[in-house]
C-alpha cells in the first residue's frame, strides 16, 4: 500500500487527495439503496399478509409511524454531528462512549449481515439463465468474484459509488414504470381489498415491512463526506422517502390490481418477474430479472460504504485502533472496507430468513438507543447547533419517537428463540470487546489516534464524560 495509503497522525503531515464530496442527487440514491433498492423483496408482504390489502396498507402506514420519524431523527442528528461515525457519535454524546461503542458494534454487525444477502440474491436471479450457478463448484467462486469486484468499486471512491447508485436505480425502476403502464387497462381496484385472515403470518409480515423500510440512519455514517450536510441531508432524506414509497406502492398496486386475488399465495421473493411476464410478456420478465440483479449490486455498494465509513469514524474518535482510519489515495477507508468484506464472506452461508430476523433484532436494539439519544440530547444539550431541527418541543419529539419505538419492540418480541440466543451472544461479545479495547489502548498494544489530531467531534472529552456519565466513562476509549 505504501504511498497509496496514509493514516491520520501527528507524525505524518501528508494526506490523500481529498475525494469529491457527495452532492444531493447521489446522496438521495445512496439513501434509497440503504433502505430499499426497489420493490424486490416486498412480494412476501402479500403472502404473509394474506392478500394485497395488508401489504398496501402496510406500505402506506408504516412509513408514517416508522420511516418518517426515523428520517427526521437522522436529519437533525446527522446535521448536528456531520462526522463519519454517525449514530455512534450521537449515542456517545448522549450516553457516553460505552453505549456509543455498543451501538456501533450492533449496527456494523447488522449491516454486514444485511450485505451478505446481496451477492447471494444476485446469483439467485442469474441462475434462472445460468443453471450452473446452482452448483456449489460454480457458486462459491462466483460469490467470491462478485464480492471482491464490488469491494474494489467501493475502494475506488464514494463519489463513484454515488454515481453508480443513480445509474443502477434508474435501470432497476424503469421496468416497473413500464409494467404499471401496461397494467392500467386490467386493474380492478376491488382486488386491492382482498385479505384472507386465515393465512396471515404476523411475524413474517412485520419482519418484511421492517426490513424493507429501515436503515434510514445508515447514511449518517457518511456525513463527513457530504457537501454542505446541513442543507443536503434533510433534502436528500425527504426525496428518498418519496422515492422508496413510490417504488413499493406503484408496482404492488399494478401487480395485485391486474392479477386475480387467487394468486396471493404465490407472492414470494422473485415473484415480480412472473408478474411482469403475465402483464407484459417474456421480455418484461427478463428486464425485471436483470433489474433485480443490478439492484442487489447497488444495495451492496451503499451498505458497504456506510459500514466502512462507520468503522473509520469510530477510529477517528478513538474507539478503534488507528489502522481503521487508514485511507487510500481515493480517500476511502481501506482496512475498514476489507474488514466489512471479510464479514460478508463469512456470513453468506446463512439463509435469507435467518439473516433478516437476526439483523432486524440487532438493528431494533440500536434504534431504541438512537430514539432515546435524540430525546436526551434535546434535554441535555438544548443549545447544540442544529442546522436542521425537527419543529417540535421535547414532549413533541418524545411522542414522535413513541410509535416507532413500540414497533421495534414488537419486532423483537416476535423473534424466534434462536434469534434471541444468537443476538444475546453478539450483545455479550460487544460488552466484552469494549473493555478489551480499553486494555489494548492502556497497554499500547495498538496505536489509537491522539485527541489533538482528531477531526472536530461532538463527543465530550474524558473529563467531561467523567462528570456526565459517572463510573462508566472511567473505562473510556475516548481521551
Swiss-Prot record:
<dbReference type="GO" id="GO:0005886">
    <property type="term" value="C:plasma membrane"/>
</dbReference>
<dbReference type="InterPro" id="IPR002293">
    <property type="entry name" value="AA/rel_permease1"/>
</dbReference>
<feature type="transmembrane region" description="Helical">
    <location>
        <begin position="395"/>
        <end position="415"/>
    </location>
</feature>
<keyword id="KW-0812">Transmembrane</keyword>
<protein>
    <recommendedName>
        <fullName>Probable polyamine transporter At3g19553</fullName>
    </recommendedName>
</protein>
<feature type="transmembrane region" description="Helical">
    <location>
        <begin position="420"/>
        <end position="440"/>
    </location>
</feature>
<keyword id="KW-0813">Transport</keyword>
<dbReference type="GO" id="GO:0015203">
    <property type="term" value="F:polyamine transmembrane transporter activity"/>
</dbReference>
<feature type="transmembrane region" description="Helical">
    <location>
        <begin position="130"/>
        <end position="150"/>
    </location>
</feature>
<keyword id="KW-0769">Symport</keyword>
<feature type="transmembrane region" description="Helical">
    <location>
        <begin position="86"/>
        <end position="106"/>
    </location>
</feature>
<feature type="transmembrane region" description="Helical">
    <location>
        <begin position="332"/>
        <end position="352"/>
    </location>
</feature>
<feature type="transmembrane region" description="Helical">
    <location>
        <begin position="53"/>
        <end position="73"/>
    </location>
</feature>
<dbReference type="GO" id="GO:0015293">
    <property type="term" value="F:symporter activity"/>
</dbReference>
<feature type="transmembrane region" description="Helical">
    <location>
        <begin position="304"/>
        <end position="324"/>
    </location>
</feature>
<feature type="region of interest" description="Disordered">
    <location>
        <begin position="454"/>
        <end position="479"/>
    </location>
</feature>
<comment type="function">
    <text>Probable cell membrane polyamine/proton symporter involved in the polyamine uptake in cells.</text>
</comment>
<dbReference type="GO" id="GO:0005783">
    <property type="term" value="C:endoplasmic reticulum"/>
</dbReference>
<feature type="transmembrane region" description="Helical">
    <location>
        <begin position="275"/>
        <end position="295"/>
    </location>
</feature>
<feature type="transmembrane region" description="Helical">
    <location>
        <begin position="236"/>
        <end position="256"/>
    </location>
</feature>
<keyword id="KW-1133">Transmembrane helix</keyword>
<dbReference type="InterPro" id="IPR044566">
    <property type="entry name" value="RMV1-like"/>
</dbReference>
<comment type="similarity">
    <text>Belongs to the amino acid-polyamine-organocation (APC) superfamily. Polyamine:cation symporter (PHS) (TC 2.A.3.12) family.</text>
</comment>
<keyword id="KW-0472">Membrane</keyword>
<feature type="transmembrane region" description="Helical">
    <location>
        <begin position="22"/>
        <end position="42"/>
    </location>
</feature>
<dbReference type="Pfam" id="PF13520">
    <property type="entry name" value="AA_permease_2"/>
</dbReference>
<dbReference type="GO" id="GO:0015846">
    <property type="term" value="P:polyamine transport"/>
</dbReference>
<keyword id="KW-1003">Cell membrane</keyword>
<feature type="transmembrane region" description="Helical">
    <location>
        <begin position="160"/>
        <end position="180"/>
    </location>
</feature>
<feature type="transmembrane region" description="Helical">
    <location>
        <begin position="355"/>
        <end position="375"/>
    </location>
</feature>
Amino acid at each position: 500500500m505504501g504511498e497509496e495509503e496514509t493514516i491520520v497522525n501527528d507524525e505524518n503531515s501528508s494526506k490523500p487527495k481529498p475525494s469529491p464530496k457527495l452532492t444531493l442527487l447521489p446522496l438521495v440514491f445512496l439513501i434509497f439503496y440503504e433502505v430499499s433498492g426497489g420493490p424486490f423483496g416486498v412480494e412476501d408482504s402479500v403472502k404473509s399478509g394474506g392478500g394485497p390489502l395488508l401489504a398496501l396498507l402496510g406500505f402506506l402506514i408504516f412509513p408514517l409511524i416508522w420511516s418518517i420519524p426515523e428520517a427526521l431523527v437522522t436529519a437533525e442528528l446527522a446535521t448536528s454531528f456531520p462526522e463519519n461515525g454517525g449514530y455512534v457519535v450521537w449515542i456517545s454524546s448522549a450516553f457516553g462512549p460505552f453505549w456509543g461503542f455498543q451501538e456501533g458494534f450492533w449496527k456494523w454487525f447488522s449491516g454486514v449481515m444485511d450485505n451478505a444477502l446481496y451477492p447471494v440474491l444476485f446469483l439467485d436471479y442469474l441462475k434462472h439463465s445460468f443453471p450452473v450457478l446452482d452448483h456449489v463448484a460454480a457458486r462459491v467462486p462466483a460469490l467470491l468474484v462478485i464480492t471482491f469486484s464490488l469491494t474494489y468499486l467501493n475502494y475506488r471512491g464514494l463519489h463513484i459509488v454515488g454515481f453508480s447508485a443513480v445509474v443502477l436505480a434508474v435501470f432497476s425502476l424503469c421496468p416497473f414504470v413500464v409494467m404499471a403502464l401496461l397494467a392500467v387497462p386490467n386493474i380492478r381496484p376491488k382486488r386491492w381489498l382482498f385479505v384472507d385472515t386465515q393465512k396471515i403470518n404476523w411475524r413474517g409480515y412485520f419482519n418484511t415491512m421492517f426490513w424493507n423500510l429501515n436503515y434510514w440512519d445508515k447514511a449518517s455514517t457518511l456525513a463527513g463526506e457530504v457537501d454542505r450536510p446541513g442543507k443536503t441531508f434533510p433534502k436528500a432524506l425527504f426525496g428518498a422517502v418519496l422515492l422508496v414509497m413510490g417504488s413499493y406502492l406503484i408496482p404492488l398496486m399494478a401487480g395485485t390490481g391486474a392479477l386475480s386475488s387467487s394468486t396471493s399465495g404465490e407472492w414470494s421473493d422473485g415473484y415480480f418477474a412472473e408478474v411482469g411476464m403475465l402483464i407484459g410478456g417474456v421480455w418484461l420478465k427478463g428486464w425485471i430479472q436483470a433489474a433485480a440483479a443490478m439492484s442487489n449490486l447497488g444495495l451492496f455498494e451503499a451498505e458497504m460504504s456506510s459500514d466502512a465509513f462507520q468503522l473509520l469514524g469510530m477510529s477517528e474518535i478513538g474507539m478503534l485502533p488507528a489502522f481503521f482510519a487508514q485511507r487510500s489515495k481515493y480517500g476511502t477507508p481501506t482496512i475498514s472496507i476489507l474488514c466489512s468484506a471479510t464479514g460478508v464472506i463469512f456470513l453468506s452461508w446463512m439463509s435469507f430468513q435467518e439473516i433478516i430476523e437476526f439483523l432486524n433484532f440487532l438493528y431494533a436494539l440500536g434504534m431504541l438507543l438512537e430514539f432515546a439519544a435524540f430525546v436526551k440530547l434535546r434535554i441535555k444539550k438544548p443549545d447544540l447547533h442544529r442546522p436542521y431541527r425537527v419543529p417540535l418541543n421535547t414532549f413533541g419529539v418524545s411522542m414522535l419517537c413513541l410509535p416507532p419505538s413500540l414497533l421495534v419492540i414488537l419486532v423483537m418480541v416476535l423473534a424466534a428463540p434462536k434469534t434471541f440466543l444468537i443476538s444475546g451472544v453478539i450483545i455479550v461479545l460487544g460488552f466484552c470487546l469494549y473493555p478489551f479495547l480499553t486494555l489494548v489502548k492502556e497497554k499500547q498494544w495498538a496505536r489509537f489516534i491522539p485527541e489533538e489530531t482528531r477531526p472536530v467531534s461532538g463527543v465530550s472529552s474524558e473529563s467531561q464524560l467523567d462528570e456526565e456519565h459517572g463510573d462508566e466513562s472511567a473505562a473510556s476509549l475516548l481521551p
